[in-house]
Every structure is written in structure tokens, then in C-alpha cells.
């Protein structure tokens, strides 16, 4: 047995029989152990630099000039061939928290026919998936990866398969990727502080600690083709702290496994088939496109915080053009698959943006297909898309219960409160109509007496989620969003053409101290709506349909589950327009503010004007 002392200012990687293991000063290792000394980077390559220079170590370190031989740990590579351009037919086995297969700063590298097995016990203390520290592959400053016919297995907290930052891009072709997460260290505090965050903010209504891909910076981009991407809980594919990231997925599967979860998570009554979390995260004016993709997740098919996502088929030619170079990255015939999403909620929005379901895309949601906690969202449903809702709700607008939880400002940034409280009864009965509530007379981030929703409850004017959301940089919008965001535009749109929608559309905003948002529903050519449209009031319910007035961080999964009652609070306006031969078959009474029925359109229902100027649209007797 032997020990090794690291030279001052250097990094040490330990190899035992070709397997990378953790280096612990003073620990004894077998006589055949190899100690490889490398130098740390002199500058932090990531756009996220709030943690200083990370001690990156990798089997291959790449820069603009090629492979950095002096700082690569090639002894961790077994079999196959390794050249200046890439590796083929190799295996890399790693067990320490923070080792990587390849770290590239501006370089180009290809991985083919390989196995990257990173089976670690990372608990989140020594990694950061906002800087790519500990990611299996990490690309910075214009790096380019191509990964083909390769298997990646990552175990451990916050150990993504890929981190792509600042003009970097990666193409996955015919790969199998699994990111399993691990057990968080004792004392971990749930927050949106990107320096320490290795699990999603609980106010998203999700759990876990594993993301398969994280794209950040300026146009961090990934392309995924003919690949199965699996994560355990949190998110399969994510964009995060940056602007104009791009994600393209075609003829692939995206799955949340939900295996070996913490005991408290096993009580989640909603994520019973797949893991808690989302298929993708959309933030920072990101553009995401899914062509012939199966998305199977326990909570949100996607989370929208700012950007555009298009869900379509893979018929015809699949062509990906780099948003960085303008060059064609991939072009080949698609398999003609439709995109199918199995989830609790189709898309949850807590920021503005646009969602398009087209070309036969099928959404199978146990709850609402569109769950909108923010204004400024456009939902386009077209060309034979099928939206199936288990509770009969196509679109649910509600006040943002992330904000109702609230947060406490600390030196490290906002720390979320750990309880949700709601007054018993309906908002119209317990003084929770925003326009009739007094302005807050206390810190709106801390919650009012009697819990959120009391006089001046969280989320009131200036409360969390207002302009520059709580805590500014790293505010509690989404997994480590790039700081507070401007208030989303309030108007929300549901546009339907060449589809049949079976379900209801509700605007339940303007309560609990939060601003109301207008809703505009337009049924166009070839559109049929079989359902109700109404202004409503909402309250939270549990899995048995009973009002849920209190739950804690351990019951994060109850967030967003609400019921509706028709009610116009004076501000949650709804306008419905039928044009180009559209049909609305009214199935239940609803309250709206304006109805336009164009020439050649059909309204199978009755319209009654109410004393307050609203309209009640009901089924024909």
C-alpha cells in the first residue's frame, strides 16, 4: 500500500487498474495505483463563474490547439484508439465525484463506439452543473462534440452527461444515455442559488437531482438523433443560465425513470409511472424543437420560462442548422414518427413564450395540457394534434403558487420557504380577490400572518415573481434561471386550427395578491372545441379532490393541482373568437367577456348577457 502527496497548486487523479478513483490526501492505495498530476486551468472557462476556477480534471482535455497532453489523464482510457481528433471503441470508468471524460475549451472532438461509465457517489458537494464541473462531457467557448453509437452511464448528484456553454454544440447520434442521480448530502438547502443548487427548486413541484443535458451561455446547443436519453428525476434535457440556447431532438426517447427515489418521494400520488420532473426546460429565449420524440415524464412535459418550443413529427427530412456557424450539422430522412408526451401536465409555464403542438403531436396528460402560471404565453395547436386530458382541462390559467410559497432573502440569495398555506374556502369568499385586497404592509417575500394569501400575501405588487423576481440573479424562477426576469406580458393566447379539442379552458387568475391575466381563445379553420370556456376561481386540492390548505416541501408534488369554480373577479377576462368555419360545441356553462362568431362558424350553445356585462355561454337545452 502507498500514499501520495499532491504538489502544491496541482491536481491529482488516481487510477487503479485503469479505473479512476477519488484522491484523498493521506489515504492508502494499492501498490499498483497510479497518481497523475495535472495543472488547474488559469481561467474559469464557463460563463457561470461565481464559484471561481473549478478544478476540472478529465481523461482528455481539449483546447483550440488540440489535445492538451500534459493535462489529460489518458490512463483512464481503456482499449480502442485515441487520436488528436477523438476516441473510438474505448471505455472510461470513473468513480470520483468530479472527473470528466472530455473537457473542451474551444476544441473539436469526436467519441464513437465507446462506453463512458461514471458510477460515483457524488452527493452534490463537489460538483456544479451550472459550470460543467463533474459533467461527463463539458464544452466551453465554441467547443464542438460529436458522440456516436456510445453508451453513457452517470450515477451521482448533478452529474449530467453533457454540459454545453457559450457557442458550444454537441451532436448525439444513435446513443444510449442514462443519468441516475444520487443521494443529496445532509443539510442541503433547497434554493435557486446557482453556486450550490444541485436539485430543482421545490416550488416547481418536482424532485430529484439529475439532468441529462444542461445548455447555458450564449447559444449553447445540442442535437439528439436516434438516441434514448434517460434521467432519474429533475429533468431529461435542460436549458438554463444563458440566452438563445438551442435544443433539437429527433426520432428519440426522453424518459424520467423514477428509480430508487427518497422515501418521501414515494408518496407522490401523481408520478407513479415515471420520475418526477420535466422533459425539457425552456428559458432565456431558448428555441427547442422535437420531431418524432417520445417524452415520458412524471410531471411536466416541459417547463416554459422564456422561449419557444415546437413539437412535430419526423416526417420528411430532418435538418439541423447550427445557430452558431450557420452550417448544416445533420441532414437525413426522418422516421415519420409523431411526438408523444405522457405526463401529469403537458407544459407548465411560469414565464412567457410560445408552445406549438403540430403534425399529429399527441399529449396524454393526467391533468391540464397547458398549465399557465404566467401571462405572455401563446399556445398554438394545429394540424391534427391530439390533446388528451385526464381531468378534462385543456388549458388552466392560475396564479403562480411558486410565488405563494415565497422566499427569504439571505446573503447567499433567496431561500424558499418550506411550506405552502392557503385559506379555507374559495378566494371570492375569504377575501383573496387581488383587486379587493389591501397593499402588503410587510415583506411580501416572507408571507403574511396566517400564511400566504393573508392580507398582502406573497406575490402581491412587488412580491416574488414581480419585475426582477425574488432575489434578482438566481431568483426562484426555474432551475437556476439567469437572474430575475422582467414581468411577462399579461395577454395569453390559445389558437387552434385543424384540430378537435375535447376539454375545458379556464382563466383562474387574479387572486391571492397576484395580477390577473387576459385570455384570448381563437378557433380557426378546421377547429372544433367540445368543452367549456370560463373565467374561474381556483383553490388547491389533493389527490382525493379535497381542498389542500397546507403542505410542506416534502409534499412538493401537490403544487399546481387545483380545482375551478366559474367566477369573474372583474379582471380575469376571457374573449372567444370563432372564424373560418370553426365549431364550438358547448358542454358546460362558462363566463366570458366577449364572443365573436364569424361567418360560416357554428356555436352549439346559448348566450345570456349578465348584469355585469359578462356573457354566460351554456349548452343548448
Cite the ranges covered by each PLM segment.
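Post-signal peptide N-terminal segment of secreted/secretory-pathway proteins
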Residues: 89-179
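Extended alpha-helical scaffolding regions
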Residues: 230-250
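Residues in short coils/turns that link rungs of repeat/solenoid architectures in beta-rich domains
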Residues: 94, 118, 154-156, 179, ...
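Acidic/polar low-complexity surface segments
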Residues: 41-69, 117-141, 166, 177-218, ...
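Extracellular beta-solenoid/beta-roll
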Residues: 389, 491-492, 501-503, 510, ...
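Short terminal (N- or C-terminal) low-complexity/amphipathic segments
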Residues: 2, 9, 21-27, 32-33, ...
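Low-complexity, glycine- and small/polar-enriched segments
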Residues: 70-74, 96, 147, 182, ...
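All-beta strand scaffolds that present successive hydrophobic residues in beta-strands
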Residues: 6, 15-16, 23, 29-31, ...
Amino acid at each position: 500500500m502507498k500514499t501520495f502527496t499532491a504538489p502544491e497548486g496541482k491536481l491529482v487523479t488516481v487510477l487503479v487498474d485503469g479505473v479512476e478513483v477519488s484522491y484523498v490526501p493521506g489515504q492508502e492505495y494499492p501498490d499498483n495505483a497510479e497518481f497523475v498530476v495535472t495543472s488547474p486551468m488559469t481561467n474559469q472557462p464557463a460563463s457561470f463563474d461565481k464559484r471561481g476556477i473549478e478544478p476540472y480534471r478529465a481523461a482528455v482535455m481539449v483546447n483550440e490547439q488540440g489535445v492538451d497532453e500534459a493535462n489529460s489523464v489518458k490512463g483512464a482510457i481503456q482499449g480502442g484508439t485515441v487520436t488528436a481528433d477523438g476516441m473510438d471503441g474505448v471505455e472510461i470508468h470513473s468513480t470520483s465525484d468530479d472527473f470528466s471524460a472530455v473537457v473542451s475549451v474551444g476544441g473539436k472532438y469526436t467519441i464513437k463506439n465507446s462506453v463512458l461509465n461514471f458510477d460515483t457517489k457524488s452527493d452534490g458537494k463537489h460538483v456544479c452543473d451550472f459550470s460543467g464541473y463533474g459533467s461527463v462531457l463539458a464544452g466551453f467557448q465554441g467547443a464542438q462534440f460529436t458522440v456516436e453509437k456510445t453508451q453513457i452511464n452517470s450515477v451521482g448528484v448533478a452529474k449530467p452527461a453533457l454540459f454545453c456553454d457559450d457557442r458550444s454544440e454537441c451532436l448525439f447520434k444513435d446513443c444510449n444515455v442514462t443519468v441516475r442521480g444520487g443521494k443529496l448530502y445532509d443539510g442541503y438547502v433547497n434554493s435557486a442559488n446557482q453556486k450550490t443548487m444541485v436539485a430543482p427548486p421545490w416550488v416547481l413541484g418536482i424532485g430529484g437531482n439529475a439532468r441529462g443535458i444542461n445548455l447555458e451561455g450564449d447559444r449553447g446547443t445540442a442535437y439528439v438523433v436516434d438516441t434514448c436519453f434517460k434521467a432519474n428525476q429533475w429533468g431529461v434535457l435542460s436549458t438554463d443560465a444563458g440566452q438563445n440556447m438551442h435544443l433539437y431532438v429527433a426520432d428519440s426517447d426522453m424518459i424520467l425513470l423514477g428509480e430508487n427515489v427518497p422515501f418521501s418521494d414515494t408518496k407522490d400520488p401523481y408520478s407513479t409511472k415515471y420520475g418526477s420532473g420535466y422533459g425539457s426546460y425552456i428559458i432565456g429565449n431558448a428555441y427547442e424543437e422535437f420531431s418524432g420524440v417520445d417524452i415520458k415524464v412524471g410531471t411536466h412535459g416541459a417547463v416554459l420560462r422564456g422561449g419557444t418550443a415546437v413539437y412535430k413529427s419526423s416526417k420528411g427530412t430532418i435538418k439541423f442548422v447550427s445557430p452558431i456557424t450557420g452550417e448544416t450539422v445533420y441532414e437525413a430522412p426522418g422516421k415519420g414518427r409523431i411526438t408523444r408526451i405522457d405526463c401529469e401536465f403537458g407544459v407548465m409555464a411560469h414565464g412567457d413564450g410560445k408552445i406549438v403542438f403540430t403534425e399529429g403531436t399527441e399529449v396524454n396528460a393526467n391533468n391540464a395540457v397547458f398549465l399557465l402560471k404566467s401571462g405572455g404565453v401563446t399556445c398554438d395547436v394545429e394540424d391534427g394534434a391530439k390533446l388528451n386530458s385526464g381531468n378534462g382541462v385543456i388549458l388552466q390559467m392560475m396564479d403562480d403558487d411558486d410565488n405563494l410559497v415565497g422566499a427569504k432573502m439571505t446573503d447567499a440569495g433567496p431561500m424558499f420557504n418550506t411550506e405552502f398555506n392557503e385559506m379555507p374556502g374559495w378566494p371570492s369568499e375569504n377575501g383573496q380577490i387581488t383587486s379587493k385586497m389591501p397593499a402588503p404592509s410587510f415583506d411580501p417575500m416572507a408571507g403574511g400572518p396566517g400564511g400566504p394569501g393573508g392580507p398582502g400575501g406573497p406575490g402581491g405588487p412587488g412580491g416574488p415573481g414581480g419585475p426582477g423576481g425574488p432575489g434578482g440573479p438566481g431568483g426562484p424562477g426555474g432551475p437556476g434561471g439567469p437572474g430575475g426576469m422582467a414581468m411577462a406580458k399579461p395577454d395569453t393566447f390559445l389558437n387552434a386550427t385543424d384540430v378537435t379539442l375535447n376539454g375545458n379552458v379556464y382563466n383562474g387568475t387574479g387572486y391571492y395578491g397576484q395580477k390577473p391575466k387576459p385570455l384570448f381563445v381563437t378557433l380557426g379553420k378546421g377547429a372544433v372545441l367540445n368543452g367549456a370556456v370560463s373565467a374561474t376561481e381556483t383553490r388547491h386540492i389533493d389527490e382525493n379532490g379535497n381542498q389542500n390548505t397546507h403542505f410542506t416541501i416534502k409534499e412538493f408534488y401537490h403544487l399546481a393541482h387545483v380545482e375551478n369554480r366559474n367566477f369573474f373577479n372583474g379582471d380575469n377576462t376571457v374573449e372567444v373568437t370563432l372564424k373560418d368555419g370553426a365549431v364550438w360545441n358547448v358542454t358546460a356553462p362558462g363566463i366570458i367577456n366577449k364572443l365573436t362568431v364569424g361567418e360560416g362558424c357554428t356555436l352549439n350553445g346559448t348566450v345570456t348577457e349578465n348584469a355585469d356585462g359578462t356573457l354566460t355561454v351554456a349548452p343548448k337545452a
